[in-house]
Each structure stands twice: as C-alpha cells, then as structure tokens.
Amino acid sequence: MFGRRSMADPPAPPAIILAGGLAQRMGGGDKALRMVGGRTLLALVIDRLASQCDILALSANGDPARFADYDLPVIADPVDGFRGPLAGVLAGLDWVAEHRPAARWMLSTPADCPFLPRDLVARLHQARIDQQADIAVAASAGRSHPVIALWPVGLRIDLRRALLADDIRKVDRFTARYPRAMAEWPVEPADPFFNANTPQDLAEAEGLAMREPD
C-alpha cells in the first residue's frame, strides 16, 4: 500500500528521536540527558544515527531550550495528553511531511538506546523490501523493539485517527494493522538495542561503553 516493493528509496531517511518519556524509574527528568561514558544518552544516539539519516529531529514536550546544545528541531506532540511514543511518531511524520516533502520513509528510535547498530537504516529498508511490508521493526533475541522502526510518511493520517478516534497508545497494537517486517540483530557481544531505563541500566551501559569498539 505504501510502495513496499520499491528499490529506489533514498538511503538516508529523516529520523525522529523519541525523548518524551516520563523516566519514572530514574526519578523523573530527561532520561536522554543522563550520562554514559562522559556523554549523554542523546549524544550517543545522535552519533549512531547521523551518518545513516538525512536529518534528525527530537520529539519532546516542555521547554525546548534544554536541548539547545544539540542543534536539533524539537517537536512537541501534536495531540493533547500523554499518549506515549505513538504521539512522538506522529509528531515526526507530520514534521517530515512539512520539512522533507520528498521523503517517503522516516526512522524512529528512542533516546535511551546508546548502542544502536550503524547498519540500522540499511537493514530495516532491506527487510521491508524482502518481506513486502509497510513497516519495518528492529528485533533482537527473538523480541521486537516496536519504536525502533521505519515508517511510511503516508501513514500519518491513519495514525492520527488511531490516536484521536480509537485511543490506541500501544505501538504494537497500531502496527499490527499493517504488514510488518522484522529485521533481527545478534545480541553478541552485546544487544545493540540495550536501553537504559533505570540507574542500574546506566551503570551497565557504562561497562558496555568501555567495551564498544566504535
């Protein structure tokens, strides 16, 4: 439905980094600004995505000035109420439609995954094509990571309706409506989709960062 068979897609789509979580297990605040290896989680994510994507934007509510050091567009949720990551995805799709009108695809990732694979975009694109899907989702250890995904920009109308009319908030529940591709990554020497949700996770990430070759 969204051109899933096309091989002519641009190799570097826009990306939205989702930083709107409440970080309750870390005591609140901006999880994206927590430090790992002397850098913020957000800086590490940007480093992983910069060479893979045409442009990066940040999905976050509140005062955008707190992210001024990163020189990224900061986009608030386009719907009222805290509706979770799907609202951030919609914010990104709307932003891409306005600022990158030629783009057909958008990558989404959370801001708390500091070791994202450097072939993320390429492998998601290939999985989408090979499996003739509308959406491509990352997976590891037999588990999908729904917010690490490649989305068709044209899906934004359906997504807005799902959020506002159907009150759908779970990413899996929404994407189950469409053909989905899964791209699986190995978890050795470490899971590239490790995410930092707790202070203990941050401590573990410090150790992983010391062993990361790149």
UniProtKB/Swiss-Prot annotation:
Cofactor(s), names only, from the UniProt record: Mg(2+)
Coiled-coil parts of chain: none
Protein's GO biological process: bis(molybdopterin guanine dinucleotide)molybdenum biosynthetic process
Positions bound to Mg(2+): 112
Alphabetic keyword roster: Cytoplasm, GTP-binding, Magnesium, Metal-binding, Molybdenum cofactor biosynthesis, Nucleotide-binding, Transferase
EC assignment: 2.7.7.77
Keyword Transferase: yes
Entry-linked InterPro entries: MobA-like_NTP_Trfase, Molybde_CF_guanTrfase, Nucleotide-diphossugar_trans
Catalysed transformations (reactions): Mo-molybdopterin + GTP + H(+) = Mo-molybdopterin guanine dinucleotide + diphosphate
Residues involved in GTP binding: 18-20, 31, 77, 112
Gene Ontology MF annotations: GTP binding; metal ion binding; molybdenum cofactor guanylyltransferase activity
GO cellular component, one term: cytoplasm
Function in brief: Transfers a GMP moiety from GTP to Mo-molybdopterin (Mo-MPT) cofactor (Moco or molybdenum cofactor) to form Mo-molybdopterin guanine dinucleotide (Mo-MGD) cofactor.
Complexes and interactors: Monomer.
UniProt family annotation: Belongs to the MobA family.
Comment block on domains: The N-terminal domain determines nucleotide recognition and specific binding, while the C-terminal domain determines the specific binding to the target protein.
HAMAP family with a match to the protein in the record: MobA
Name of the featured protein: Molybdenum cofactor guanylyltransferase
